[in-house]
């Protein structure tokens, strides 16, 4: 419980750095997330509630990122549930009819961006926002060494930066 409270505080601090004004915590246990029907339903409800044009999530199939690191099982589970919430769940009246009865009308997401895939077809130049990304990640001190974040983010981003269709700054 203490770790969960700490992680929420860290996330709120990171979101403040990024200018994110509202955060919704679903409060599933850390380290135990599964791509369950309950999680998919929660995400479907949020999609129907907020009606986003775009959803961005991780790669549900991404176990390894090159030789860099092993992807956390919670991240894979969240990504799978997010993809399944986008399609087919959020856009149809046939799934989660109780959400429909509660006033959550189906909503079709127009774009789904999946990051962390070896088959990427979109690259975005993050040069202009790298410092703020690093500062936001530094807020997660229980998960990463704040003094090392800048180094490993730069090492991670630099080889990918040439793939961006934008000019580098």
Predicted regions and their residues:
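Metal-dependent de-N-acetylase/amidase catalytic core
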Residues: 36-169
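Active-site rim/loop-helix segments in enzyme catalytic domains that contact anionic ligands
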Residues: 1-53
């Amino acid at each position: 419980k203490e770790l969960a409270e700490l992680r929420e505080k860290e996330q709120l601090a990171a979101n403040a750095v990024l200018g994110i004004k509202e955060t919704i915590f679903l409060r599933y246990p850390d380290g135990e997330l599964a791509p369950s029907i309950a999680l998919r339903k929660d995400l479907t409800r949020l999609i129907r509630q907020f009606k986003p044009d775009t959803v961005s999530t991780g790669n549900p199939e991404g176990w390894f990122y090159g030789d860099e690191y092993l992807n956390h099982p919670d991240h894979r589970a969240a990504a799978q549930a997010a993809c399944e919430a986008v399609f087919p769940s959020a856009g149809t009246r046939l799934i989660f009819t109780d959400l429909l009865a509660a006033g959550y009308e189906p909503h079709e997401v127009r774009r789904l961006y999946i990051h962390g895939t070896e088959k990427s077809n979109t690259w975005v130049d993050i040069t202009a926002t790298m410092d703020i990304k690093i500062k936001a990640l530094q807020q997660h001190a229980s998960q990463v060494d704040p003094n090392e974040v800048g180094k490993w983010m730069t090492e991670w981003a630099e080889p990918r930066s040439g793939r961006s269709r934008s000019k580098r700054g």
